[in-house]
Design a protein with these regions (language model features):
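Residue-level signal for inorganic ion chemistry
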Residues: 30, 78, 143, 178
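Positively charged, low-complexity intrinsically disordered leader regions
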Residues: 1-18
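Conserved phosphate-binding loops in nucleotide/dinucleotide-binding enzymes
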Residues: 174-202
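Divalent-metal (Mg2+/Mn2+/Ca2+)-assisted nucleotide/phosphate chemistry catalytic cores
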Residues: 65-140
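ATP-dependent adenylation/pyrophosphate-handling site
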Residues: 41-62
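Di-metal (Zn2+ and/or Mg2+/Mn2+) metal-binding site signature of metallo-dependent hydrolases
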Residues: 26-40, 150
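Conserved small/polar residues in nucleotide/adenosyl-binding loops
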Residues: 213-219
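Internal alpha/beta domain cores that form substrate/cofactor-binding pockets in large enzymes
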Residues: 116-136, 141, 149-170, 176
Length: 219
């Protein structure tokens, strides 16, 4: 594993390879991230993993400040995987002096679900993802289906900007109780964590088919 803070150093390593996989992350890596990276390793000659907590996608400075960070542990996890190229930029490297959200034509989709609760969030995500895609020109870029609204919008961004990259959606990796793995799970207290696990159990229960006999019994 090799870690770089400058994208120019990485470009020198990958500009002549047949296929490059990119896995954008905000760090605090867990098994969900590692599953994306393993898939990228199986499908590409070189794999770049970016670790950058993007300030443009946060709606408050407190939320940004609280986001879990553990770069030392992250790099150790990458070291254990394979020949990973880690990109660990600071704000100046990523945005220079132009630290502004780009506005995308995502339409009404940004005004529902997470977009409704976090105005401007997806423009912030799109800004950093587009920068990473243009920096490294990867063959494939990997994102979890856990953030399905984000995944759909990134695919829309790629079409809108006419970027030549294959966006790969990867299945959600879950905890033992069914909760989707997330870096933010670390911010939950015991009561909140238990409640989160209970919600997914209720959702799974609701998906179970109701038998015809059961319906007849309640007529």
């Amino acid at each position: 594993m090799r870690a770089y803070s400058s994208h120019k150093d990485i470009i020198k390593l990958v500009n002549k390879v047949d296929s490059v996989g990119l896995v954008p992350t905000m760090g605090s890596l867990h098994e969900g991230h590692l599953s994306l990276i393993r898939r990228a390793l199986s499908e590409n000659e070189k794999v770049i993993v970016s670790i950058y907590v993007n300030p443009l996608q946060f709606n408050s400075s407190d939320d940004l400040k609280k986001y879990p960070r553990d770069i030392k542990n992250d790099l150790q996890k990458l070291e254990a995987l394979s020949d990973i190229i880690a990109y660990v930029p600071n704000d100046n490297e990523m945005y220079k002096k132009d630290k502004k959200k780009k506005k995308y034509n995502f339409g009404q989709f940004t005004k529902i679900m997470e977009g409704k609760m976090r105005p401007g969030h997806f423009n912030g995500v799109g800004t950093v993802v587009e920068k990473l895609l243009r920096m490294f020109n990867p063959t494939n870029a990997y994102f979890g289906e856990k953030d399905f609204q984000q995944l759909i919008l990134i695919k829309a961004l790629v079409r809108e900007q006419k970027l030549k990259v294959n966006i790969v959606g990867c299945k959600t990796i879950r905890e033992d109780d069914g909760l989707a793995m997330s870096s933010r799970n670390k911010l939950l207290n015991n009561t909140e964590r238990e409640s989160a696990g209970h919600i997914i159990r209720l959702l799974n229960k609701a998906r179970e088919p109701v038998s015809y006999t059961h319906l007849r019994a309640h007529e």
